């Protein structure tokens, strides 16, 4: 099977325009970190649209480590991303499963933190994230995956807000690959 769309400069520009028009807001906001900001990025209107998810999935897949057996991320922002990337991988002829990391363990049954087809212990998993601010959400997902016996080396985000998250992720010994930084989204917003 072939990917329905190949990533290239035109598709990256199209995705940036979608983020600027549908995900970016300018005003006075309190972020999940508690910090105040004039910039707010909510990627869900893009990641939950068919066209947006298609663009995101293919671009993120290009950055998933070759030895990863799964992609995972903290619910809710990463849910469409992990599913989209796993599907894009299938179209590309690659086996890559999707895992969702709960914010809290399941309150009944297995009390699991992870949902999805679990790969063997010791497997490499790439973490997906919509927006990195402080890095806490990404690192929470990494921590739960490592506690379950998996290896995580890389986090892929849609947008790095450039507020210290990349530093915290690097300090934890992980790579961060971001499709865009906040400055790029803001510049596109101003010029669209």
Curated annotation (Swiss-Prot):
Its EC number is 2.4.2.10. It is an enzyme of class 2 (transferase). Keywords: Glycosyltransferase, Magnesium, Pyrimidine biosynthesis, Transferase. InterPro entries: OPRT, Or_phspho_trans_dom, PRibTrfase_dom, PRTase-like. SUPFAM superfamilies: PRTase-like. 5-phospho-alpha-D-ribose 1-diphosphate binds at residues 102-103, 106, 129-137. Disulfide bonds: none annotated. Orotate binds at residues 133, 161. GO terms for biological process: 'de novo' UMP biosynthetic process; pyrimidine nucleobase biosynthetic process. Pathway: Pyrimidine metabolism; UMP biosynthesis via de novo pathway; UMP from orotate: step 1/2. GO terms for molecular function: magnesium ion binding; orotate phosphoribosyltransferase activity. Its cofactor is Mg(2+). It catalyses: orotidine 5'-phosphate + diphosphate = orotate + 5-phospho-alpha-D-ribose 1-diphosphate. NCBIfam families: pyrE. Catalyzes the transfer of a ribosyl phosphate group from 5-phosphoribose 1-diphosphate to orotate, leading to the formation of orotidine monophosphate (OMP). Belongs to the purine/pyrimidine phosphoribosyltransferase family. PyrE subfamily. Homodimer. This is Orotate phosphoribosyltransferase. The gene is pyrE.
